[in-house]
Every structure is written in C-alpha cells, then in structure tokens.
Swiss-Prot record:
CDD domains: YajQ_like. Keywords: Nucleotide-binding. Gene3D superfamilies: 3.30.70.860, YajQ-like, domain 2 (3.30.70.990). This is Nucleotide-binding protein XOO0711. GO terms for cellular component: cytosol. It comes from the Bacteria. The keyword Nucleotide-binding applies.
Length: 161
C-alpha cells in the first residue's frame, strides 16, 4: 500500500548558516556598532539572543526571522521564551521546535477523518504515517494538509508506492 510520512523538521545545517548570517549582519549594522549583541546556537535546538537592552533584542528577533526565511526555514517552528532583563543586559531564548507533538498529530488525524478521505493515519513518535490504497488518495491528503493552517511547518517525505 502506498504511504508517506508527515514530519516537522528543520535542517540543522541551514539553521547554523542562518544564525551565522544573522551574527554577521549584527556586526555590519550601524545601530549595533560597539554593542555586545550576539546570537548563539546551542545543540541545534536553542538560539540565545543577548544584547544590552530589550529593544535591541526585539530588533535582533526581526533580523533572525529575516535570515531564517532567506535560508528557507519556516519561522513557525520558533518558540520565543520570556525576555530576561537585568543590569548586564537582556536575553531571550528561542526554541526551535522539531517533530510533531501528540496533540498536534491528533489534530492532523482529525482533519483527515473529517475530510472523509480513504486514508489511514498512524502516529509514530514525532511523525505521522499516512497510508492509502491509491496514490491519488495520498495526493489528496497532502493537498488537504497543505491547505489547512497549522501552527507548525509540515514536510512530506518517504513517499512509497
């Protein structure tokens, strides 16, 4: 039976490149001259933003979003933490979400069942496997999931015929 997987993943290499480009942009921007502002990537999952003031951290957020979009990374995978401010400066943690959570996977399955497509969906850890008898049914399922607006970016891979 034909099948495919629905995943929500971020290419770690592109993420590293985007963070490096954002740091280079901080070095060249006039409003960040002489300021200790930087992005740090930890374990490919968390981006730390630090600057002397919370206003500059907000500007850095815009820079980071622009660089991620330029590298083809959907910004819906980012989860911004609370702003931490003290006398030394301001910091914010940005978590990069990987995988589909159980609750979101159930929403995807419910959406497929609601459309009454002739496909079956199984939740396998942090991904969703969709199987059907015909390839056309799977293509309809892909079109439905692309059209539906979920708060996370979806990729479709491992298409087996």
């Amino acid at each position: 039976m034909p099948s495919f997987d629905v995943v929500s993943e971020v290419n770690k290499h592109e993420l590293t490149n985007a963070v490096d480009q954002a740091n280079r942009e901080l070095d060249t921007r006039f409003d960040f001259k002489g300021v200790q502002a930087k992005f740090e990537l930890e374990d490919g999952k968390v981006i730390n933003q630090s600057a002397p003031s919370d206003f500059q951290v907000k500007q850095m957020t815009d820079i980071l979003r622009a660089r991620l979009l330029a590298r083809g990374i959907d910004v819906r995978c980012l989860e911004f933490g609370d702003m931490e401010t003290n006398l030394a400066g301001a910091r914010q943690k940005v978590t990069v979400k990987q995988g589909i959570e159980q609750k979101q996977a159930k929403q995807l399955v419910a959406k497929l069942k609601e459309a009454k497509l002739k496909v079956e969906a199984q939740i396998n850890g942090d991904k969703l496997r969709i199987t059907g008898k015909k390839r056309d049914d799977l293509q309809d399922a892909i079109a439905l999931l692309k059209k539906a607006d979920f708060e996370l970016p979806l990729q479709f891979d491992n298409f087996r015929d």
